[in-house]
Amino acid sequence: KPVYKYSFYIHIFAGMFCIVAALTQFSSYILKKRKAIHIWMGKTYVLVVLVLGAPTGLYMSFFAKGSFWERMLFMFMALYWFYSTMKGLQTIKVKNVLAHKNWMIRSYSMAMTAVTFRVYHLLFYYFDFDHLHNYEISLWISVLGNMLVAEYIIYRKSKSYLKTFLA
């Protein structure tokens, strides 16, 4: 399947870029002292997610190993990554910085599932889980865990937490 193969490599490149690029986005030094870098890297992150990362993730979700539910989870991840990134873009365009920051935290939490999945997968490997169960459990924990951590970070920093869902 050449389309899958190309999608896979594009998705991997996009994910690696997004993880590295986002590190500059959460730096208070860069935000305050080098705002142009923040803006340029932010625009690039959004472009890479919306054009490369999320669409290839959605395509590959149809072929993911595991059960129907794991394929649905991969679809959800791709769609939520796209949606949260789009909301981050929309909210900064109307100068709603708090909502922008919160939506981008959510977006980054989806990008980071690639990392947390591998950490859990390695951890459960040492507990002698069979490969498929390890894969499924690691996937669910990484996605739900990252989403919960993102919401906790947003909640902890925000006095108007619920308003960011409406922005």
Where are the regions that the model predicts?
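Alpha-helical membrane insertion/targeting regions
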Residues: 1-167
